[in-house]
Amino acid sequence: MADRKTALVISAHAADFVWRCGGAIALHQELNYEVTVACLSFGEKGESAKLWKQDGMSLTKVKEARKDEAQAAANALGVNDIRFLDLGDYPLRLDQVAQEKMVDII
């Protein structure tokens, strides 16, 4: 496994990696890279307007839906390693604990 090339995608919101670099991810998967996607936030506030319009929606349900969407997209792209840091949304702050989580991923 040590000889396998790796790629790291850092995505501010759970779905950003798909439309910002889905093609690059697919290409790297095809080239046998081990791709890791790190989602800093679920985008539960600024990226989830349609979900919030549904009856009975809660913050927990929005996050679960966004996680499921991102996981499905990662699966479609062949990504086996997707990490969700759940750092919040609007504001998204990278405090010391969050920085340490990123260092662990890198």
Feature-to-residue mapping (PLM):
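Active-site rim/loop-helix segments in enzyme catalytic domains that contact anionic ligands
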Residues: 1-106
